Regions:
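NAD(P)+-binding Rossmann beta1-loop-alpha1 motif at the extreme N-terminus of oxidoreductases
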Residues: 1-54, 103
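NAD(P)-dependent Rossmann-like dehydrogenase/reductase catalytic/cofactor-binding core
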Residues: 2, 24, 172, 206-327
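Active-site-proximal catalytic alpha-helix in oxidoreductases
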Residues: 16, 141-144, 150, 170, ...
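Rossmann-like NAD(P)-binding element
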Residues: 33-36, 51-109, 117
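Rossmann-fold dinucleotide-binding core
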Residues: 112-178, 183-187
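Hot-dog-fold acyl-thioester-processing enzymes
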Residues: 326-386, 442-469
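Hydrophobic beta-strand-centered segment that forms part of the acyl-chain substrate-binding groove
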Residues: 366-416, 430-432, 438
Length: 469
């Protein structure tokens, strides 16, 4: 059954929500009275189509459909999920919620992208307050997984569980904020850092670039993979968090922050910040900065994925839901993926070593298909590659979608030979690989025949592929 989402407000955040749902196979209807909405959303979608597939080593679902609507009623009438991303004014949000609830289903989730309002404030005067909750994202929504899911005591339990399931299904991380508070959790941290930054600029201690450098070369990297408290736990050494608190606790009474003392944003201070920001980043367009941001995020999150940590572990979990069985097609489609930006080299194309990785991934998919999966390997059996011959026929570029078709050339006892073809979207051949593998006992580290069930599957595939040649 096709899943349907309505996006009310198609700015940077609404457009990001739209892209996240659309690229995960949802049909989308969007309402935004801005005459430039379609153009702005197309810019966000262009970035998302370039970036999101690069996070995964499995193909995303086929894109859903996208329709621009002229009324809220048209957008929400059959939606399973409704995301409100209108300006941060409570009167506007109340008016929009009233229009939404006049036409939407009672079991639909209504999420608000608000960064500051509490759900109880959003629900005031609502016909069905149990539908409404805060689902606060982070820009770019199509890449960053955190969603602060904030219900009130009036929000329905079933709506909360449905929201969690839907958000998880599209690769997001719903952080259930159990007690509502102004600005939720993350924005309270951001506000504290922002206020301190304003003072550092106003007092002439640091420029915008120096503040950003302090973050991106230092604690920002630690926070990306461990957060605040786990970082400080390490700072406590072997004695742990209690030692850290005992050591640094006295600092709380020292003049290290002006947290509650906020400088007035005068015209002079505003212009100073704007001028420094222009000097720092004005040589790049917003589109160039967005692409740089996205490429950096992809590389960082893929590194975290390799370690099974933080946002990387979430990508792996979502990727597992995307993996499809190979089926009976001959040859088998063993890989379908987008080329990540961190796989390219100084020539601007995929490094030759990554061709080998893609063919290795194709062999892994074959092994899973014949039953030589993780359990089989854990039981002490596997296949080792003894020889490969790769021919590089054309370039592969970052963001390009490629697929691999694999044919079994030989299945003879402990020996198996595969032939892989890597192809572009237009079916042009980019590279080929002939791969010879031996079955190995992982205890003795010597070759041996595979178990009977695996041997049977290998032989059947080899025969089917021979007959279709």
């Amino acid at each position: 059954m096709t899943k349907k989402a309505a996006i009310i407000g198609g700015g940077v955040i609404g457009g990001g929500w739209l892209a996240r749902f659309l690229l995960n196979g949802w049909d989308i209807k969007v309402f935004d009275p801005d005459p430039e909405a379609e153009r702005k959303i197309s810019e966000v979608l262009k970035n998302a189509r370039h970036a999101l597939p690069m996070l995964y080593d499995q193909p995303l679902p086929n894109e859903g459909t996208l329709k621009f609507c002229t009324t809220i009623k048209e957008a929400v009438s059959d939606a399973d999920w409704i995301q409100e991303s209108v300006p941060e004014r409570l009167d506007i949000k109340h008016r929009v919620f009233a229009e939404i609830q006049d036409s939407c289903r009672g079991d639909a989730v209504i999420g608000s992208s608000t960064s500051g309002f509490k759900p109880s404030e959003l629900q005031e005067g609502a016909e069905r307050p149990e539908q409404i909750m805060v689902t606060h994202p982070f820009n770019p929504v199509y890449l960053l997984p955190l969603i602060e899911l904030v219900p009130s005591i009036k929000t329905g339990t079933q709506h909360i569980e449905t929201a969690k399931d839907i958000l998880t299904s599209i690769g997001l991380y719903p952080l259930h904020v159990r007690k509502e508070i102004d600005a939720h959790i993350a924005d309270r941290f951001l506000e504290a850092v922002w206020r301190e930054g304003l003072w550092l600029i106003k007092d002439g201690i640091a420029t915008t670039e120096e503040i950003d450098n302090a973050i991106r070369y230092g604690f920002g990297l630690r926070w990306a993979q461990m957060g605040l408290f786990e970082t400080y736990r390490i700072a406590g050494g072997e004695a742990g968090m209690a030692h850290f608190i005992a050591q640094f606790g006295p600092c709380l009474s020292w003049p290290w922050t002006k947290l509650m003392d906020v400088p007035e944003l005068t015209d002079e201070l505003t212009q100073m910040i704007a001028d420094q920001s222009d000097a720092q980043s004005g040589h790049k367009t917003i589109r160039e900065l967005e692409r740089l941001r996205d490429n950096n995020l992809i590389a960082i999150m893929r590194a975290l994925k390799q370690q099974g940590s933080a946002a990387g572990a979430l990508i792996t979990a979502h990727e597992d839901t995307l993996r499809m069985p190979l089926g009976a097609a001959v040859p088998m489609r063993t890989v379908s993926r987008s080329i990540p930006v961190d796989w390219t080299d100084y020539n601007g194309h995929m490094n030759e070593g990554r061709y080998g990785q893609i063919f290795s991934d194709a062999a892994d998919a074959f092994m899973i298909e014949i039953g030589a999966d993780a359990k089989y390997i854990a039981a002490g059996n596997s296949f080792f590659t003894a020889e490969t011959t790769i021919k590089y026929l054309a370039e592969a570029l970052a963001g390009q979608t490629v697929h691999v078709k694999t044919r079994v050339l030989l299945s003879e006892g402990k020996k198996v030979k595969l032939f892989h073809e890597m192809r572009a979207e237009d079916n042009a051949i980019l590279a080929t690989c002939e791969q010879f593998m031996l079955h190995v006992n992982l205890t003795t580290r010597k070759s041996c025949p595979p178990l009977a069930e695996v041997q049977s599957r290998m032989d059947a595939l080899a025969q089917a592929h021979k007959e279709s040649a």
